[in-house]
Amino acid sequence: MKVSLPAFEKARVLVVGDVMLDRYWVGPTGRISPEAPVPVVKINQVEDRPGGAANVALNIATLGGQVQLAGLVGQDDTAVALTLGVQTLGVEPQWLSIADKPTITKLRVLSRNQQLIRLDFEEAFDKADSVRLLKQSEALLDSVDVVVLSDYAKGAIDQPRDFIALARSKGVMVLVDPKGSDFGRYHGASLITPNMSEFEAVVGTVTSEADLLEKARGLLKEHHFDAILVTRSEKGMTLVTANAPELHIPTVAREVYDVTGAGDTVISALATSLAAGADLPQACAIANTAAGVVVGKLGTSTVSRIELIEALALHHGESGFGVVSEDQLAYALEQAKLRGERVVMTNGCFDILHAGHVSYLKQAKALGDRLIVAVNDDASVKRLKGEGRPVNQVDRRMAVLAGLASVDWVVPFSEDTPQRIIARLLPDLLVKGGDYKIEDIAGGAEVIAAGGQVQVLGFEDGISTTAIIQNIMANQ
């Protein structure tokens, strides 16, 4: 599957659920305690990170989505720390403060990149607290496209069926990261994302792939879900819907350091992608890739858009050079700019590649680090040059160009001018051969407006594709 990132900045998501503070005490261990056979950790670093539903919200914000966050907290210093943690990424929380309950805190002691112990500070919230939170959140439904219910069984999401029904009636998708053995609580949700343990806690032991699909479809029918995405660790993910074949997405192989928050990353990437307009298979592939990134980090972490672009390019074959699609080139171009490389772009028909072309492309490449050549497809060449052209089909023209040492990427376009593709890619330098005026070069205005430059290069006199064709015909 070729995966394209949607415009995450268009995503509008509401996250409701169990928020918590993940606190880390970190330090070296050099000896065993004389009091008990346990290591002594000399703490030299303390770090607080938003966790649970708050981590989901931060993941969405890090990807570039617009996110609102609602959850239950205590009236304590931990709530203040949690608030500051989410506000650093522009997330303004809609807390419901409960006077007689602490803000949930999970304290982890780490040494040498290993977790030694976890201490939980929490008390379950009352059902009435959940009712008030969901009622408060109803007012936010008109301003979002997707709702995430992040359920850690701490009391924030107790009986959400009415809330789900209201959201669906407003055309808002509801995604649920479930907990517990009763998925009926989430009746009518658009999508639920159980891991394999959570799935089997509800349906029983899964004995085969066919058994998994049968049990998943049973849940779809029983609880009126649109889809179930089962996350399966090293086996990747399986998406099951009522009206389409199942989709198996293999895991993104990499070394796993910490699975903390991986489920948060999956549902946040799903929600952001769907809210930005991606279809469900694309959103699942993006979520799978994001999870592969986050398990390579220690502790509760987020995934940035750049990290996601790099991972997609690596695992979906979209970072290479040579002949590429426009979407593939967009990924590769972002990577190049991230590396600080200067990107040059030119365009043309290049019907019969000749010495003049080679010289021109060599000059263009010398002006930067990477060279893009956009090539007119066959239909546009015929419109521009007339009957009998092109002599060479676009695939052959691009293959020859890609073989030149000076050319990094070759991409086709179908319009008569390359203005649209240039405006999308926005190279650092746009070059054109011949006697053009800069203001007449297609795409030049867009490049200049974005801070780039436009330059005209000379062609070698006496050499042209038309002249070569005429010479061949004259000698027949």
Swiss-Prot record:
Keywords linked to the UniProt accession: ATP-binding, Carbohydrate metabolism, Kinase, Multifunctional enzyme, Nucleotide-binding, Nucleotidyltransferase, Transferase
Reactions listed under catalytic activity: D-glycero-beta-D-manno-heptose 7-phosphate + ATP = D-glycero-beta-D-manno-heptose 1,7-bisphosphate + ADP + H(+); D-glycero-beta-D-manno-heptose 1-phosphate + ATP + H(+) = ADP-D-glycero-beta-D-manno-heptose + diphosphate
EC number: 2.7.1.167, 2.7.7.70
Source organism, top-level taxon: Bacteria
CC per GO annotation: cytosol
Active site: D264
Pfam families tied to this protein: CTP_transf_like, PfkB
InterPro entries in the cross-refs: Bifunc_HldE, Carboh/pur_kinase_PfkB_CS, Cyt_trans-like, PfkB_dom, RfaE_dom_I, RfaE_dom_II, Ribokinase-like, Rossmann-like_a/b/a_fold
Region annotation Ribokinase: where it falls in the sequence: 1-319
Associated pathway: Nucleotide-sugar biosynthesis; ADP-L-glycero-beta-D-manno-heptose biosynthesis; ADP-L-glycero-beta-D-manno-heptose from D-glycero-beta-D-manno-heptose 7-phosphate: step 1/4; Nucleotide-sugar biosynthesis; ADP-L-glycero-beta-D-manno-heptose biosynthesis; ADP-L-glycero-beta-D-manno-heptose from D-glycero-beta-D-manno-heptose 7-phosphate: step 3/4
Region (Cytidylyltransferase): 345-476
GO biological process, one term: ADP-L-glycero-beta-D-manno-heptose biosynthetic process
Molecular-function GO terms, alphabetical: ATP binding; heptose 7-phosphate kinase activity; heptose-1-phosphate adenylyltransferase activity; phosphotransferase activity, alcohol group as acceptor
Binding site for ATP: N195, M196, S197, E198
Quaternary organization: Homodimer.
Reported function: Catalyzes the ADP transfer from ATP to D-glycero-beta-D-manno-heptose 1-phosphate, yielding ADP-D-glycero-beta-D-manno-heptose.
Similarity section: In the N-terminal section; belongs to the carbohydrate kinase PfkB family. In the C-terminal section; belongs to the cytidylyltransferase family.
Protein name: Bifunctional protein HldE
Upper lineage: Bacteria, Pseudomonadati, Pseudomonadota, Gammaproteobacteria, Alteromonadales
